[in-house]
From Swiss-Prot:
GO molecular function: nickel cation binding
Entry superkingdom: Bacteria
Any one cellular-component term (Gene Ontology): cytoplasm
Location of this chain's protein in the cell: Cytoplasm
Purpose of the protein: Required for maturation of urease via the functional incorporation of the urease nickel metallocenter.
Record-linked Pfam families: UreF
Keywords tagged on the record: Chaperone, Cytoplasm, Nickel insertion
Gene behind the chain: ureF
Family: Belongs to the UreF family.
Oligomer status and interactors: UreD, UreF and UreG form a complex that acts as a GTP-hydrolysis-dependent molecular chaperone, activating the urease apoprotein by helping to assemble the nickel containing metallocenter of UreC. The UreE protein probably delivers the nickel.
Protein name: Urease accessory protein UreF
InterPro entries recorded: UreF, UreF_sf
Length: 237
């Protein structure tokens, strides 16, 4: 998005901002509220017990785990669509669907990806969307779905990437607020505290290639596996 000015947005800038705010709003019905990315087990196990430990947990997931990897998948899917490279898009889609640590995390990303595409297909159709989805030839991970939709709508990549990561972190915080629990003010303090990490992770993902993918959030990955057999659960992951 352009630097701040006193003048109005252009029609294209206004449309891009409007669509990002809509697609990545908590009100957009992809079912994000029902997933915790393993956080529910982390609270059960005592790894996350208050605002400070939640901040550390989410910061690690963002910078060294699913947040960064999903950002790379989004950017690579966007660029493949922009270049008209169906083979590259298919490779990104397959890798994104495979590179998850548990069955529940696979459900989380592919169910949201499917819902996102279906809603956009009916309400925000664009030239090239059907071809891009068809090229993927299988389940679509959520970041890949967001990347290819934004590319077909010509929404700027950097803005899409930062908005996506903000939405992901916001959903994690929402889950944490219900589980720890946290109040509304603490939740907003946490979101504000993670702003630099969201920006830095978005910038890093924008410059990264698929060769840079990887993570070091083993406890978060194990939490997503342990959640599958957790006795009492609020969330699907």
């Amino acid at each position: 998005m352009p630097e701040a000015t006193a003048g109005p947005l252009s029609a294209e800038q206004g449309a891009s901002l409007y669509r990002l705010m809509t697609w990545l709003s908590p009100a957009f019905p992809v079912g994000a509220f029902s997933y915790s990315s393993g956080l529910e087990w982390a609270v059960e196990a005592g790894d996350v017990a208050d605002a400070a430990s939640l901040r550390d947990w989410l910061g690690a997931m963002l910078e060294h785990g699913a947040g960064f990897c999903d950002g790379v998948f989004l950017a690579q899917a966007y660029r493949a669509v922009e270049a008209g490279d169906d083979a590259a898009l298919r490779d990104v889609a397959e890798l994104a669907a495979a590179m998850v640590p548990s069955a529940e995390r696979h459900l989380e990303t592919t169910a949201q990806g499917k819902a996102f595409i279906e809603i956009v297909r009916h309400a925000w159709a664009s030239d090239g969307l059907a071809r891009a989805v068809g090229a993927c030839n299988g389940a679509l991970a959520y970041p890949v779905a967001v990347g290819l939709v934004s590319a077909t709508h010509r929404v700027p990549l950097a803005a899409t990437l930062h908005a996506f990561l903000h939405a992901v972190v916001s959903n994690w915080i929402s889950a944490g607020a219900r589980l720890v629990p946290l109040g509304q003010t603490d939740s907003q303090r946490l979101l504000a505290a993670l702003e630099p990490a969201v920006i830095a992770t978005g910038d890093r993902a924008l410059r990264a290639s698929l060769d840079d993918l990887g993570g070091a959030t083993f406890r978060a990955d194990l939490a997503s596996l342990r959640h599958e057999t957790q006795y009492t659960r609020l969330f699907r992951s």
